A protein has these predicted regions:
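Sec-dependent bacterial lipoprotein signal peptides
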Residues: 1-24
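N-terminal low-complexity, Pro/Thr-rich disordered segments
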Residues: 24-79, 273-286
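Sec/Tat-exported extracytoplasmic proteins
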Residues: 84-91, 95, 167, 179-186, ...
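A small/polar (G/S/T-enriched), proline-flanked helix-loop surface module common
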Residues: 98-221, 225, 285
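Soluble non-cytosolic domains of exported or imported proteins
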Residues: 71-72, 81, 118, 169, ...
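Solvent-exposed, polar/charged alpha-helical surfaces in well-ordered, non-transmembrane soluble domains
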Residues: 75, 79, 85, 169, ...
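A short, solvent-exposed beta-edge/loop patch
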Residues: 58-60, 197-263
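Surface-exposed amphipathic alpha-helical segments
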Residues: 247-286
């Protein structure tokens, strides 16, 4: 699999120069941070959960799939998180992902740039605000967990949680509409600077019970220098549980990593909801 080359600089350089991103201090592995209450996901435990605690309730004999009836537990959510082995390449798992925030996502959408005015602008504002606060699928109704990985100046945030089937279906339908509603719009940042945002649909592997992918491009300035943030956003429904992947950075997006995270993550979640312990992912890439 061909992967684009990346700058050798590390994420902390981008943070130090203040070009894009802010990260608040956060303790513990992949946890839901006290310092960043906007994040919905629960803290990831380094210990391996027992098989019996991965999901609650048993599927009925007539149920077509275990994922349709099982509820995700806290231990199950942690077990469903992907690992470095799942996405491979040069990704490194980090312990502060719950506090990640992208400054370029903060701003007020320009209502005047929409033909149908306030209605469309509200959807686009919701998109930016929910991406910033890690709540694109809403607040989990049950158990949840998250983890994150870095590679150069790119970051991949992976969330899994029980959101409820109906809520997830509405979220996926809403995401599907954004490529038309929010195809291009302008945002005014807190510094008064103008940013251009483009949203397009992106393809995902045919996994889960429903899925939707978007690619978001934000162009603006930081410290007087032009800067571009490009993000893949991918959501998958498995029963009443959902997966959300946000991947990218100022150097662009590795779409292959997004697709791999979606594919491997869906498989892990399905195994957990079936009452199984996800098996380690074998290395298959050069």
């Amino acid at each position: 699999m061909h992967r684009p080359s990346r700058p050798a600089r590390v994420l902390t350089l981008a943070l130090a120069t203040g070009t894009l991103l802010v990260t608040a201090a956060c303790a513990g592995d992949t946890g839901s941070p006290e310092a960043a209450p906007a994040s919905p996901a629960a803290k990831q435990s380094p210990s391996s959960p027992s098989l019996s605690s991965l999901s609650s309730s048993s599927p009925s004999p007539s149920s077509p799939s275990a994922s349709a009836t099982r509820a995700l537990t806290t231990n199950g959510a942690k077990a469903a998180l992907i690992t470095e082995a799942d996405i491979e390449d040069a990704w490194t798992q980090v312990n502060n992902a719950a506090s990640w925030r992208d400054k370029l996502l903060v701003g007020k959408v320009d209502v005047a740039s929409f033909l149908n005015g306030e209605t469309s602008s509200q959807d686009c504002q919701k998109l930016l605000d929910s991406l910033y606060s890690d709540t694109l699928l809403g607040r989990p109704a049950g158990a949840s967990a998250l983890t994150g990985f870095t590679q150069g100046d790119a970051r991949l945030l992976y969330q899994v949680g029980d959101y409820g089937k109906g809520s997830l279906e509405k979220s996926l339908d809403w995401m599907k509409s954004l490529a038309d509603t929010c195809d291009q719009f302008t945002v005014t940042g807190s510094d008064g600077g103008k940013r251009t945002v483009q949203v397009v649909s992106s393809s995902l592997p045919a996994v889960g019970d429903g899925r939707q992918g978007l690619t978001l491009t934000v162009q603006g300035t930081s410290n007087g220098e032009p800067v571009t943030l490009k993000l893949d956003v991918a959501a998958v429904r498995v029963g009443s549980s959902g997966i959300l992947v946000t991947n990218g950075g100022p150097s662009g997006v590795d779409h292959d990593s997004t697709e791999t995270a979606v594919q491997q993550g869906t498989q892990r979640l399905q195994q957990v909801l079936a009452g199984k312990t996800p098996s380690p992912t074998p290395t298959t890439l050069d």
